[in-house]
């Protein structure tokens, strides 16, 4: 499970060891609508259902009822210049079912305040574009004259 080698036991040495697996688990927003107690994760290809369940229960204290996994094939792309084909890496997805009493809602990363700020920034950008276009239109009849040489 892990590629780390631990030192050989010698009498008198402290034996406090931390086991760090080479696994990773990433929370993914599902493409299709899922029930509220089903959570989708992208995980490393080496993880099994049992590994995913233990990972969530032991490290994060998340109660798990069922785990289903699937492997999504990576897409293929043709190079535009040389014409050879490359394949993206396959990804493994784990669908974790929580108890019926537990519900998971995907966190709102961009709250309404941030959305409002983004809209304000877009509006100010549009105003700047409009003013620049008006400035360019004003100097159309004087080609070759620098912009600072205006009234």
From Swiss-Prot:
Biased amino acid composition, Basic and acidic residues: 120-143
Q: Which UniProt keywords apply?
A: Mitochondrion, Ribonucleoprotein, Ribosomal protein
User: What Pfam families would the database entry show?
Assistant: Ribosomal_L23
Q: Name one GO cellular component term.
A: mitochondrial large ribosomal subunit
Q: Which InterPro entries match?
A: Nucleotide-bd_a/b_plait_sf, Ribosomal_uL23-like, Ribosomal_uL23/eL15/eS24_sf
Q: Which GO terms describe its molecular function?
A: structural constituent of ribosome
- Annotated region (Disordered) at 120-151
Q: Which cysteines link up through disulfide bonds?
A: none
Q: Which GO terms describe its biological process?
A: mitochondrial translation
Localisation per UniProt entry:
Mitochondrion
On subunit structure and binding partners, the annotation says: Component of the mitochondrial ribosome large subunit (39S) which comprises a 16S rRNA and about 50 distinct proteins.
Q: Belongs to which family?
A: Belongs to the universal ribosomal protein uL23 family.
Protein name per the record: Large ribosomal subunit protein uL23m
Query: Could you tell me which species this protein originates from?
Result: Anopheles gambiae
The organism's lineage is:
Eukaryota, Metazoa, Ecdysozoa, Arthropoda, Hexapoda
Originating gene: mRpL23
């Amino acid at each position: 499970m892990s590629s780390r080698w631990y030192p050989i036991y010698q009498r008198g040495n402290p034996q406090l060891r931390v086991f760090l697996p080479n696994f990773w688990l990433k929370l993914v927003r599902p493409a299709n609508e899922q029930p509220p107690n089903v959570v989708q994760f992208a995980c490393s290809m080496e993880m099994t259902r049992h590994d995913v369940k233990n990972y969530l229960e032991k490290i994060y204290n998340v109660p798990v009822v069922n785990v289903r996994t699937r492997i999504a094939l990576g897409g293929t792309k043709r190079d535009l210049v040389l014409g050879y084909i490359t394949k993206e890496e396959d990804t493994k997805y784990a669908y974790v079912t929580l108890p019926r009493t537990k519900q998971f809602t995907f966190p709102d990363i961009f709250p309404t305040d941030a959305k409002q700020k983004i809209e304000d920034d877009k509006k100010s950008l549009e105003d700047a574009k409009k003013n620049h276009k008006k400035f360019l239109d004003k100097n159309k009849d004087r080609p070759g004259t620098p912009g600072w040489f205006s009234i």
